[in-house]
Amino acid sequence: MWKKPAFIDLRLGLEVTLYISNR
């Protein structure tokens, strides 16, 4: 079982990357 915080961190990082790329 992987930790949820890690999943949230990865998801947040991905969203931030997409946001910056979309700018």
Swiss-Prot record:
Classification via NCBIfam families: PQQ_syn_pqqA (TIGR02107)
Matches recorded under HAMAP family: PQQ_syn_PqqA
Ribonucleoprotein among keywords: no
Signal sequence residues: none
Pfam families: PqqA
Pathway membership: Cofactor biosynthesis; pyrroloquinoline quinone biosynthesis
Family the UniProt entry places it in: Belongs to the PqqA family.
Coiled coil: none
Descriptive protein name: Coenzyme PQQ synthesis protein A
Record bears the keyword Phosphoprotein: no
One GO biological process term: pyrroloquinoline quinone biosynthetic process
Keywords associated with the record: PQQ biosynthesis
Gene behind the chain: pqqA
Cross-link (Pyrroloquinoline quinone (Glu-Tyr)): 15-19
Entry function: Required for coenzyme pyrroloquinoline quinone (PQQ) biosynthesis. PQQ is probably formed by cross-linking a specific glutamate to a specific tyrosine residue and excising these residues from the peptide.
